[in-house]
């Protein structure tokens, strides 16, 4: 199955947290296996690293700004988030940005609440405004994927598995 086979050529994808561990892996795969244009919205915090993305661009012999554009933006700033969404004009948004250390979320929950809850809310508001301005044809294909964590399900039970029907049982501000 071809990656993004239901999307038009040169699909514009906005990925939040694209310089993080999982976001970086998603961007590398998209750059290698599609012709999409990636807008990497990241605040470039302590866990951000562009090295692997830059290596892929070099190996593909692609100019950095042609297929990958870094938008240094913190989602807790609504006006910057709205500007980034307007600028990228995405066909697809993948929301992977999050503060992600469970222990740190317990020690200082305020930062996690601001970043993970307010940041997500700001992105959703900006995406809604963007969606309302899309043509009928683009609305049919537009998607927003919010990627979460298995931490929302709490501690593994005796069977050691979660599935789509597992109940939420968060145990920390991170989850």
Identify the role of each PLM range.
Residues 1-175:
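N-terminal Rossmann-like NAD(P)+-binding domain of SDR-like oxidoreductases, especially those catalyzing
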């Amino acid at each position: 199955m071809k990656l993004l086979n239901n999307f038009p050529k040169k699909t514009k994808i906005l990925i939040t947290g694209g310089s993080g561990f999982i976001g970086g892996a998603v961007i590398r795969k998209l750059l290698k296996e599609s012709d999409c244009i990636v807008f990497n919205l990241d605040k470039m915090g302590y866990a951000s690293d562009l090295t692997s993305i830059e290596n892929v661009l070099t190996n593909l012999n692609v100019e950095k700004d042609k297929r990958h554009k870094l938008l240094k933006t913190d989602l807790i700033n609504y006006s910057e988030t709205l500007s980034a969404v307007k600028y990228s004009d995405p066909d697809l948004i993948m929301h992977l940005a999050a503060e992600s250390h469970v222990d740190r979320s317990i020690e200082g929950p305020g930062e996690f609440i601001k970043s993970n809850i307010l940041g997500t809310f700001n992105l959703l508001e900006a995406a809604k405004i963007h969606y309302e301005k899309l043509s009928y044809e683009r609305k049919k294909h537009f998607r927003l994927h919010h990627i979460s964590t298995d931490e929302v399900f709490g501690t593994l039970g005796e069977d050691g598995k979660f599935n789509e029907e597992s109940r939420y049982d968060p145990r920390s501000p991170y989850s």
